[in-house]
């Protein structure tokens, strides 16, 4: 029952992004970028070219823009902001397997393609795990971390939950065939109501891959090397979170030397549902993690 409840909350959260979204404004245009040896993915690149760079890494079942569009206009005032659709999400790379390691390497490959040397990696939920892995696998490229509503491991670390995720994926394969897949051109149409735009973004990720996502999340565990993280790190704790419970988020605060804690009075979808309360502490968190690069 706990497993089913966790899944139900996750689906409600994903649909909540769509049905009660934060009003969209100044959504940046994007383009497909082909990463040599890896594949094509959808990318947005906005803000001052000479400003410190922040990569925004999204949560599961969303896209780079669906997860992060509320914060981009404010960030663009003093940061160059990059979003990307991760593997099998939206217009992300299609690969035989889904791996957070691969997602982390995609971030650095994209930075190479864009001519970006060093950057702050900010991630929400799944994106927080990817951000940690970007530092772990490419420490020389990361100037700071911003970890939001995430932890050092995910619930599918538990084999029972991972098995449930696979069963759910099989069920959703049939459901996914009945759902309309938005035409690519319509994903970029921001003239429609935010709910319509958000629904198109949501439907661009195949629900049939839920099992693969669960497997990819389940193998992630940073607890053994958290103490090695040596860049400015901000942790944004969602205090009403029922997906990544606050106690698990606090492990990042306690485990990373010098980590600064920020708080948002919201649940696991706070980046969009209640974004007006998420944006201020998130911007503060980015500023704190980027202090070194800004001063330099």
How would you describe each model-predicted region?
Residues 36-93:
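Conserved HGGG/HGGXW glycine-rich cap/lid loop of the alpha/beta-hydrolase fold
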Residues 156-158, 174-227:
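Conserved alpha/beta-hydrolase catalytic His-Asp/Glu region
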